[in-house]
């Protein structure tokens, strides 16, 4: 579900680039102009810009905003380590990057004329694949080839039964992460789009927008929390 008017689509039309719906997209160029792709670039540019500005203003003795954000980031990192253990500290940059990307993507669609990339299943599936694939990278990093024993069950003669169940379970993780995030953000986009269409950009959508601020944060938090738990499971099996 898209807002009635998307600014980037209008810009592309002015430049002579025709934006087609996902069903009509046939070429790679058509795919690159899809809203979930173009607004993903917007989110990435915003995050890169904020990161660059934050890096330039760093001081050895933190004060003001830097001090506040260092406390927040340290608290989040400590929370993650309480789940994954000290061995999982190295995955914090990935968790933080996924969390910031999902959070900003969730919030972007609340601005009239913009679209939430996470309201498209392709974006959420990509994030879920990163999380699940990296889970196995962690397992192999800590456990080597023996990590495959996790899929074989406690005794060898149960392998034909346990292995298919484990494989299905890991595929279900991708579906769970992607569909949960997509469904919640898409539902919010759907309601906002209807309210904007019926009542304009004024008071009617405000209650839903306040709810969207809360649910957008919760969905980003749940995605990161589940990813932490998957990473912790891979590290524990490595022990």
Curated annotation (Swiss-Prot):
Gene encoding the protein: atpB
Predominant location category: membrane
Record flagged with keyword Ion transport: yes
Subcellular compartments: Cell inner membrane
Known function: Key component of the proton channel; it plays a direct role in the translocation of protons across the membrane.
Identification of the protein by name: ATP synthase subunit a
Originating species: Syntrophobacter fumaroxidans (strain DSM 10017 / MPOB)
Gene Ontology molecular functions: proton-transporting ATP synthase activity, rotational mechanism
Coiled coil, from the record: none
